Amino acid sequence: MSQKTLFTKSALAVAVAIISTQAWSAGFQLNEFSSSGLGRAYSGEGAIADDAGNVSRNPALITMFDRPTFSAGAVYIDPDVNISGTSPSRRTLDADNIAPTAWVPNVHFVAPINDQFGWGASITSNYGLATEFNDTYAGGSVGGTTDLETMNLNLSGAYRLNEAWSFGLGFDAVYARAKIERFAGDLGQLVAAQNPALAPVAGQILSDTKIAHLNGNQWGFGWNAGILYELDKNNRYALTYRSEVKIDFKGNYSSDLPIAINRFNLPIPTATGGATQSGYLTLNLPEMWEVSGYNRVAPQWAIHYSLAYTSWSQFQELKAKSTAGDTLFEKHEGFKDAYRIALGTTYYYDDNWTFRTGIAFDDSPVPAQNRSISIPDQDRFWLSAGTTYAFNKDASVDVGVSYMHGQSVKINEGPYQFESEGKAWLFGTNFNYAF
């Protein structure tokens, strides 16, 4: 396999990790920006203004706040993703708990300037992914470690035109850091079985040999906007938009395979003997639209709902280049647009207690033929519940919990065939304070 193909495999893994959005929503795009939202399956987020976290979804909601308001917390993700299968070498491909637990923090602040203007800021994570396999895993050439961490800094402002209409605009700065590692697994055995003449060479490739390592980091920038229409104090509707984010991702590649192996033209990544090479790829994270509604149908009851649409069809190909500008890889991906639908209800028990629940469905944007075990994406169903306790008119705490279940899917990757099924529990808490 050529050096071109070697970097291609690593670049592909990083690219898919970064652009596959919402770690525990379809496509692995993170939704977890607040704990109150978690408790209602993030339904109606563009139209609800019960804490500062909603402003990160719709900046027009800034006009709903009459005091500076702060919110901070985190969501704990406890996934259970398992892989099963058998390699052509007869070695098992079974692996349990390939996705580690994770914390997703969030911080939000909203401040009105006057009756018409206000501003807000937030720190969240909109993208994230982590899968880990043992170094000696038989499918290590497609498994290994895939780790993506992001931080989104948002600064926004809003303007109230009249009692009914408000408009908001925000700026996003996204920092992304990724690491990809791949190991030989049973590739040596497969090569020897296909061509016995190469058995002596293939036998030198141990299962835990690191055949690819890539890491890098970069900033990307985008914007978001929102419109809020208040029919009256009990009924409001929202339209929100988040732009593409272009990330010129820079990375370093290395392989621990000895360079001498290259002359045998084995079907493995090109060896660099541990030396590092540079490369880059440009990713355009897809835009997202969302329509939300909130209706207080009774003094103590409200319903809320959302329909989100992500333009994943904008991701039709993946192209990696060297620092010299040569095309290293170009592949048609053909992702499809995906949607998310959510419905929830809130019960305002008294001045201290609020209870909420919600359900949601996440449509996967990844076609079946493009699934991988490093990103075993699938459609997901949410079931959520949560509560808020207000200590007084200034301070409150949110608690939310969600259970997500993904359908069982088949994955064909390289010489391997897998089956994957995943579920996850999410627990969140936020503290809110109005000054």
Swiss-Prot record:
Residues 1-25 form the signal peptide. It is found in: Cell outer membrane. It is a multi-pass membrane protein. One of its GO terms (molecular function) is long-chain fatty acid transporting porin activity. Pfam families: Toluene_X. Its main location: membrane. GO terms for cellular component: cell outer membrane. It comes from the Bacteria. InterPro entries: OMPP1/FadL/TodX. Keywords: Cell outer membrane, Lipid transport, Membrane, Signal, Transmembrane, Transmembrane beta strand, Transport. Involved in translocation of long-chain fatty acids across the outer membrane. FadL may form a specific channel. Belongs to the OmpP1/FadL family. This is Long-chain fatty acid transport protein. It comes from Salmonella typhi. The gene is fadL.
